[in-house]
Amino acid sequence: YYASRGLGDVYKRQVICIIGGKKGVKAIASLAFTGVCIVYLMFPLMYRGISPIGITIVVVILSTLLTLWLLGGVSKKTVSAVVGTVSGVVVAAAAAVVFGKAAGITGYNVSDIETLNYVAQNTQIKIGQLLFSGIIIAALGATMDVGMSIASTIQELHERSPQLGTKELFVSGIRVGRDMMGTMANTLIFAYVGGSLSTLVVNYAYNLSYNQLINSYVIGTEIMQGLSGTLGVVLTVPIAAAVAAVLIGKKKIVKEPLMQDIYDGSDDYEEPETDGEYGEDV
């Protein structure tokens, strides 16, 4: 079993490297870096009592910086994508906390809460924030995809049509982002529903009424995750578009040569004298 699973992982990496080339190798490297940050940075700090939400945002920033740097290098496009991604994730985190307080979801209404309470007795981990940390990590992939796509689109437009100004590039980025909002929102919703599918099936089997179902902690948590993640994706679009339009869309004014520049800066240029009906130079 373990040998077959290991071979499967090797084949997956080979396929990514063959199809993606250098980009595929860099994607695997960034994924490995994110895993190392989660296991060796986020988890130990959580056990020492550091806020899970705060340390998760730090890990998200580090992962975003390395991933987008490997894929796009140090450029205005990368800076725009990083700003848009981090802003979207922060918005998703803030929205999750606000929605959680409004709906009375404290973070203790999660699976394995009994085990977590036992672990918390011997550690300083703040288990009430783990739910919101999971929302932040789940929203990272979608916001990063949107931020990089918007920045790449604006850069391509600027290279193809340098005459476009900041406003035109921003509007074009917003138009492209509108098409991505719906698909990315569906991606987040489907991911959350897929992760809690067994629990949803159990609730359906008990034939609960609509009021009981919609007011349950499970459904409330799913709605909170979907709304906060979607809000983060939606706000990533204008932020990334605005930053990219400002950084990438700066026009370089080319000075047109004047007549005096053509004639070595002489202001007393005179037409050559001619004589005769055929205009021969004297």
Task: Identify the function of each model-found stretch.
Residues 1-11:
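Single conserved hydrophobic/aromatic residue that forms the stacking wall/gate
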Residues 10, 193, 199-282:
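Hydrophobic alpha-helical transmembrane segments of membrane transport and translocation systems
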Residues 13-118, 128-135:
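Transmembrane alpha-helical segments that form the functional core of multipass membrane systems
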Residues 18-22, 44-47, 68, 102-105, ...:
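Conserved, well-folded catalytic cores of nucleic-acid-processing
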Residues 26-27, 77, 97, 148-156, ...:
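Short helix-terminus and kink motifs of transmembrane alpha helices
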Residues 28, 151-167, 250-265:
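Cytoplasmic juxtamembrane regions at transmembrane-helix boundaries
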Residues 85-219, 223, 227-228:
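Generic detector of multi-pass transmembrane helix bundles and their immediately adjacent loops
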